[in-house]
Amino acid sequence: NYARGKVLGGCSSINAMIYMRGQARDYDQWAELTGDPDWSWAASLEDFKAHEDHYRLDNSANSLDPKIQERARLHGSGGEWRVEKQRLRWEILEAYAKAATQTGIPETDDFNGGDNTGAGYFDVNQRSGWRWNTSKAFLRPVKKRPNLEIWTHAHVTKLNLSMDADGQKRCTSVEIRVKGKDHTVEAGLEVLLSAGAIGSPHILQLSGIGCPEHLASVGVEVEHDLKGVGRNLQDHLQIRTVYGVEGVKTLNKMASTLMGKAAFAIEYALKRTGPMSMAPSQLGIFTKSDPALKHANLEFHVQPLSLEAFGQPLHDFPAITASVCNLNPTSRGTVLLKSADPF
């Protein structure tokens, strides 16, 4: 089961708030495969900077400090997307980072320069201790535009195709259910489908766009043969390891009493700091599984807490969690229909 951000802001409203660009080689590979230089790291970096409001550049306009100039080469200021330093540090995480450097992994204070190899704290998408999602950043400032309507509680059920004058199929309308009532929205120019790696293939296949054999097997009439729909799903396996610790603060211990929980709430209410302001994963480590590799292919998320599964209570003993995931999985999955029912 995939967690789905069915809310304004999408997954940025429910995720771990970590601000993380890909490696430069990822974007350069896309540019090479597509033949489009706009996908390159150099071009993408300018787009990142244009929309960033990065804490490293706060109050540093026109600075001649070489360090600040280097930050300005990699980051932007005044954009919609706020990036901040985490507002909490943990002794146990500092020790973990030090252990990483002792194995030869370099220390870093910025994972977003194109080569994320290193150990350090993640930057987060927050503003003054509050989650900063794409709805707050991009949608809220323009929601009063006369040419924009925002529908909530709306579920897209089908894209309707028509043949245009030159014999090309085009999406000309969208069927939507809003609070139990069906609507058809006509497209004046174009339809943009942006429902994510799970939602987009789901909607396309419900609309008869996909592999004919699969669509026929669930009773969907084929509108357009496009066998790649729902194929090539990529995701990274994450393995969580829990380590019991002694003599240091952990969230498990601090949250084990009513007084501890109350202290969290009071600190957050008064100062927007403390455990209630923290990202679930605070410390990151990017490294190689084999020294012969050119780039980091493993990522560690290190947390000052432990639990059986996300959404379940913290363990009743002091512990930390170090999760590791593969950045470049070679396995591929599918997103296919179980039935023709959009719900």
Can you annotate each of these PLM segments?
Residues 1-51, 55-60, 169, 221-228, ...:
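N-terminal glycine-rich phosphate/pyrophosphate-binding loop and immediately adjacent elements
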Residues 3, 72, 129, 273-277, ...:
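Short Gly/Pro-enriched turn/cap motifs at secondary-structure boundaries
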Residues 11, 17, 57-60, 160-162, ...:
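Short, solvent-exposed loop/turn and secondary-structure capping segments
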Residues 32-163, 170-171, 240-262:
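Conserved redox-cofactor binding core of oxidoreductases
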Residues 76, 83, 201, 211-317:
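Mid-to-C-terminal "cap/lid" subdomains and adjacent gly/pro-rich loops that border
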Residues 152-154, 178, 224-226:
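Short loop/edge segments at beta-strand edges and connector loops
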Residues 180-198:
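Core beta-strand elements of the Rossmann-like FAD/NAD(P) dinucleotide-binding domain
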Residues 297-343:
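Active-site beta-strand/loop architecture of penicillin-binding DD-peptidases
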